[in-house]
């Protein structure tokens, strides 16, 4: 179990309603953030979220930090308000051991913002690729390529997480023509871990009047990348069936509904089945797992990433229009359909924990200067980072050695209260005697506390 770490999550929000409210419950990128939090319950998580949200704030080990993300999908990959971002954090009281960056293009900006505060020298970096930039993933040829920024981030990170072991191959498709650099796929693969994810359980159900029979659900975004063009081509001739698109931006003839989670489950359970037409670029898919979770058949266009989700032996793949029509017409006789898929979350959790453990277990060359002075303060009841630094290193902003001291403290077993947004150290009883021996020669005169120890009555009073 990973204990005592503080992790900054820079998210990749893609789902907003018409009022600008972040729809976290429908945002597949944000679901990955929540999964990593659940995998690391003994860590404190600082989550940078859109200003307008209604994410439940009920966990002591999670602090939400509001930031003005752009609502535009493309702009979010390039827009960064460095002044606002760095002013969100007060490193007199806070520490980040890891940054989990869900927009790789932004990692350099994050590091520069922290460097302006002389912070981040030994902060480890994980990248999460929810999309890979290539011509197949861009909505238009007019969109400037971003793959060089993604490659830059890979150079700056410790580990890069792709949904599957084949997803990084999309980066290589940018190098068909000669350019200023080459594509070193082996370098990327050496840093790669995978984060396959399971769909969230659809718990509540809310009946409503569907008003149609023989419903086929298209539960993907209404976009070229999800195969809508092929879908519209293949459904030609299926006049006895009603296609129901769950994206409210879909044309009216496909209903384009805006259902809540309970209604969405009811629709799936009372349909003939759902379908996936992802036919080119893809790295993962949650929507096909939703239908399978309620024991309904899901017709899946045969694509390599989809095989990673449901397995190579899945019986409802199709390629041609004729194959699709045959499977659709068989749905009426199929009824309930059971197909077990791997526990993807279990694999994801293992890869996250293993990657963190590998970094934290690297041997240390020497004990940082002043580390024993910090231990001496903690042993004498001075627990907050700001208060310790005032005793040992008054010029905190001019000295970055305390970042390395923190890593050392965690390595030898000092506790950090991860239910507090502020760094708060204590010495466990099982190592107290050892710590007393380590500091027996410390010559540090503890000054009276001139600043009241940091306390808080709510989690967010520091920004």
Language model: regions and residue ranges:
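Short hydrophobic beta-strand element within catalytic cores of glycosyltransferases
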Residues: 297-300
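Short His-centered aromatic/hydrophobic patch
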Residues: 101-107, 131
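Conserved acidic donor-binding segment of nucleotide-sugar-dependent glycosyltransferases
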Residues: 312-322, 331-332
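A short, active-site helix/loop in glycosyltransferases that binds the activated sugar's phosphate group
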Residues: 148, 155-189
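Nucleotide-sugar-dependent
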Residues: 276-286, 302, 307-308
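N-terminal subdomain of nucleotide-sugar transferases
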Residues: 1-54, 236
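Conserved donor-binding/catalytic core segment of Leloir-type glycosyltransferases
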Residues: 6-10, 161, 199, 207-226, ...
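A charged, aromatic-enriched C-terminal amphipathic alpha-helix characteristic of glycosyltransferases
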Residues: 332-370, 395-400
